[in-house]
UniProtKB/Swiss-Prot annotation:
One of its GO terms (molecular function) is ATP binding. GO terms for cellular component: plasma membrane. One of its GO terms (biological process) is response to antibiotic. InterPro entries: AAA+_ATPase, ABC3_permease_C, ABC_transporter-like_ATP-bd, ABC_transporter-like_CS, MacB-like_ATP-bd, MacB_PCD, Macrolide_Exporter_MacB, P-loop_NTPase. Residues 6-244 form the ABC transporter domain. This is Macrolide export ATP-binding/permease protein MacB. It comes from Burkholderia orbicola (strain AU 1054). ATP binds at G42, A43, S44, G45, S46, G47, K48, S49. Non-canonical ABC transporter that contains transmembrane domains (TMD), which form a pore in the inner membrane, and an ATP-binding domain (NBD), which is responsible for energy generation. Confers resistance against macrolides. Its EC number is 7.6.2.-. It comes from the Bacteria.
Amino acid sequence: MRQPLLKLAAVTRRFPAGDKDVVVLNNVNLSIGAGEIVAIVGASGSGKSTLMNILGCLDHPSEGTYTVGGRDTHMLDSDELAQLRREHFGFVFQRYHLLPHVDAVANLEMPAIYAGTPRADRHARARELLARLGLADRAHHRPGQLSGGQQQRVSIARALMNGGQVILADEPTGALDTKSGQDVIRILHELNALGHTIVIVTHDKAVARHARRIIEISDGEIVADRPNRHYAEAFAEVGVGAAATTETAADTRSAPASGDAPPPANNDTAADPAPAPDASPPAPAVSPKHAGWRGSRSCRTGCARCLTMLGIIIGITSVVSIVAVGEGAKRYMLEEIGSIGTNTISLYPGSDWGDSRADTIQTLVPADVAALAEQPYVDSATPETSRTLLLRYRNVDVHALVSGVGDSYFQTRGMRFALGVPFDDDAVRRQAQVAVIDQNTRRKLFGATRNPVGEAILVDNVPCVVIGVTADKKSAFGSVKSLNVWVPYTTASGRLFGQRYLDSITVRVRDGQPSAAAEKSLEKLMIQRHGRKDFFTYNMDSVVKTVEKTGQSLTLLLSLIAVISLVVGGIGVMNIMLVSVTERTREIGIRMAVGARQSDILQQFLVEAVLVCLLGGTIGIALSFGLGALFSVFVAQWKMVFSAGAIVTAFVCSTLTGVIFGFMPARNASRLDPIDALARD
C-alpha cells in the first residue's frame, strides 16, 4: 500500500501565552490519501483551524512530523514551503480573502503570477475557470460588486488556478445562505470526482455529511475518525451528476505548474505521492511591473502617498535646481572674467604686490614685449604704462586713467568696440596722437548720445583724436565707474609721461597651451634677459580656478541642504510604507497563502517605494525645468544650466532613496507570519 498524500505523526502545536504555552494540538496522528474528501469537525477552539493551517503549510508543528508526498515539511525552507502552497494546495476561506481593489480575473491570476505563468496563459485560464464556475459575466467585477456565493466561487477558482491538488476549505459555507452553500458543496463534490483531494474544516455536521470520511477533533485531539455512512445520500442531495461534473469543472486540474500528476479519482486506492517541492523549477521572480503596479493600486492611503511624494519632489527639485543655478552662475562668472582677459599672464616690477622698491625698478622695457611676443606659446603681448591725467573737451574737464598700451592690448584683454576702431601698429610706431575712450569717459565729455569718433580732446594739454569707443561692460563684480583712456604706449612715453620703461606687460597665452607651463617659461626667459628676477607674475588662470572652486564649494553646500530635504522625504517614504504594511497585512497573508515567497513580498514593497520615489523624482525634474524657464524671465543676465549628469544623478538619488528607505518596511512585510497576517482585519 502506497504512502498517504498527507500524513501527520504525533503532531503537537503550542503557542506562547505569557509564562506558559497553550497546547492547541496534542499528539495528532492523521493520514489523508490522494483523492479523498475529508471533513474535520469540531467546535470553536477545538484546534481544527490550526490543523488546517499545518496541512496547508501555513503553520508548522511544534513537535512531530508532517509529510506531503513523503517529504518532511520540517526540512523545507520558507521558499520551498511557498512552492508547495503555490503548486499543490488551494485555499477556500470562510471570509473569501479576495483583494478588494482588483477584479475577479486579477484575483485569480495572483497564484499564477507567483508561479511565473505567462500573462496570456494565466489570463486565459482565469477566464476559463470563471466560466466553468458560472462567473463569466462577472470576470471584471470587484469583490464588493459580487454576492457572497459569487465571492466564494471566485475563491474556489483561485484555489484551482495552479492545479489545486489539495483543496483546503475552511468553513466554506459559513458566511453563505442555504442556496449558495449548496452550490459551493456541489462544486467541491465535482472537484473531488475529478481527483482533487478535498479537506473541509467545519463545525457544522450538516456540511460534514458531504465528506466520505469525518474526523472529529476536540481540545486539540482527534476523538473520532470514521467513514461517513450517509455520504451517498448527501451526494445525491446536491445533485452532482456526470453531466454536471463535465460541464462545470472539467480540466480544472490542468495547471501551469509542472510536476503535478493528477491522482486517481478512486479514493479507496492509495495515491501517488505529491511531487517533491524541488521537482519543479523555482518560479521566476515576480516582474517589477506586477509587484509595484498591483501594490500601488492597493494602497488606501493615496493622499498620504501624495504628501510623501511631495517630500521627494521638493528634494529632487532642490538638488537639480541648485546644481543648475550653480553651473549657470559659474559659467556667467567665467564669462565675466573672460571679458577682462582670461588665459593672460601679467608681469610687474618688484617681488610682489606692495613691494616698496617697485617704483625704483625700471627694467621692464618695450624690447621685453617684442621678445615675449616671439615665443611659441604666446598669442600676443602688450606693454602698459599709466597715469591719472586731466582731460578736456571744450569747457568740460575730468580726470581719467590714461594708459599707454600696444596695438594688441584690446585683443589681449578681450575688449569689444561700440564705436570706431582700435589703433594699429603703425600708430604705435608713429607716436600717433590718437585715443580710445571708454563709455564713462564718453558720457562725461560728450554725453550719452553724441558720437565722439573724430573729435579732438586734450590729454594733459596734448591734443588727441578719438578713434574708438569700447563697449560698456556690466560686470558681476559691480559696474565700473572709472574713466579710462588708451593711447599708443609710444605716445604716452614720448609725449605724456616722459618715461622709457613700462609699468607692466600682459601676455596672452595661446589656446591649448597650459597656462602654468607658459608662466614658468616666460619667467625663465625674463630672468635670462634681466640677469635676475626683478619682477613677479600674476596669472589670471588662478582667478578662474578660484572662481571655479568657490562655485563648486557653494554648489556643494547648497546641495547638502537639498540632500537633507531629500532625506526627510525618504523618511516620509519609510513612514508611509510602514503604515502601508500595517494596513495591508491581510493582503500580505493572502499573497503568502497562494504561494508568494518572502522575496516576492520584499520585492513588491521595495518596488512600490522605488516607484513612489521615481515618480516624485520625475515630477521634481519637470518642476526644475519650469523654474529654469521662470528664472530666465526674471533674471536676464544669466540662466540656469541643466546638465545630463545632474538629471541622471537626480534619478539615481530618487531610486536609492526608495531602496534605502523602503527596505525596512519591505523586509518587515516579507517576514510576516501568514497565519497572523490572515487573522488581521
